């Protein structure tokens, strides 16, 4: 059910698969989390992890797994996870309908 409430683009899936290939470990999962900080109050974090914690929410799509803790998931529902490459660099980007403001770099937001 959650996979329909958080969209993962093809570009994000391809990048996650490349990261797993580089690490030579397809059992790793991409953890997405929200922490306090940044110029707008909250910021996104991304890490590859082996272990899913007891209360984590797991989203499996196209052979990759994304895990999100129960507190972060409430701020991400309805969002879209993408991966972009442009003149500024390359990065995962979250389009978040719950964010009232974002900073200029797009790395932090407020609710």
From Swiss-Prot:
* GO process annotations (BP): iron-sulfur cluster assembly
Keywords from the named record: Iron, Iron-sulfur, Metal-binding
Task: Give the function comment from the record.
Answer: Required for insertion of 4Fe-4S clusters for at least IspG.
The cofactor note from the UniProt entry for this protein is: Binds 1 iron-sulfur cluster per subunit.
InterPro entries in the cross-refs = FeS_biogenesis (IPR000361), FeS_cluster_insertion (IPR016092), FeS_cluster_insertion_CS (IPR017870), FeS_cluster_insertion_RrpA (IPR023063), HesB-like_dom_sf (IPR035903)
Q: Which GO terms describe its molecular function?
A: 2 iron, 2 sulfur cluster binding; 4 iron, 4 sulfur cluster binding; iron ion binding
- Is the keyword Methyltransferase in the record? no
Query: What domain of life does the UniProt record list for this protein's source?
Result: Bacteria
Q: What is this protein called?
A: Iron-sulfur cluster insertion protein ErpA
The text of the family note is:
Belongs to the HesB/IscA family.
Residues where iron-sulfur cluster binds: 39, 103, 105
- Tell me the classification of the organism that encodes this protein: Bacteria, Pseudomonadati, Pseudomonadota, Gammaproteobacteria, Enterobacterales
């Amino acid at each position: 059910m959650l996979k329909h409430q958080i969209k993962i683009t093809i570009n994000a899936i391809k990048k996650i698969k490349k990261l797993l290939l580089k690490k030579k470990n397809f059992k790793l999962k991409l953890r997405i989390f929200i922490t306090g900080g940044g110029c707008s109050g909250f910021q996104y974090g991304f890490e590859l992890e082996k272990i899913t914690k007891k209360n984590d929410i797991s989203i499996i799509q196209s052979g990759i797994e994304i895990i999100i803790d129960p507190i972060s998931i409430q701020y991400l529902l309805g969002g879209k996870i993408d991966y972009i490459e442009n003149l500024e660099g390359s990065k995962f980007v979250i389009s978040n309908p719950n964010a009232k403001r974002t900073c200029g770099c797009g790395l932090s937001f407020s609710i």
